[in-house]
Amino acid sequence: TTPQPQVKVTRPEIQLTPETPIAVKHIQFVGGTVYPLKELLEPFRPYAQKTVPLKTIITLVNAITARYQADGYPLSYAWLPDNNFQDGNIRIVLVEGYVAHSDIQSDNNGTAARLKRLTEKIMAEKPLRQETFERNSILMTRPPGSKVDANAQLPKNSYGAGGMKVKATQPHIWDISSTL
């Protein structure tokens, strides 16, 4: 038998622009516990069963993110996943961020243990609120002679798990009397 030539046909991907018309037939929110579904749907109601530019949908989704931020959820946001808008179905993913793991760096065991306890308080809250992060971050900076830098990264997954880095440095204190 002779090998048959193989033909591979690839469909060109549709390039979306802000002006791309999007049919709005059904809105599906994936995830999210902070806001009632009815409240999330309300801004979309005027566009139901209509065709609108993509930029209108993006503006509404960005407004959800802005609401999370204004309500004190710094790691939470809304986004439109790829492979969306088929047959007028619009999926909006609500990522309610929290700290799932931490990386604590300190050259002092006592400071590291204290930072771990405070980080665990941050990790216990889902989704993380700004006030919880700030309160515990401020407490992290309390040990005299230590400089602490704590930051949490936005989650890069749909279930909201993010990371936090905490670095404590202590300047070397020289006791001149012991060197004489």
Model-assigned labels for residue ranges:
Residues 1-180:
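Periplasmic polypeptide-binding modules associated with outer-membrane biogenesis and secretion
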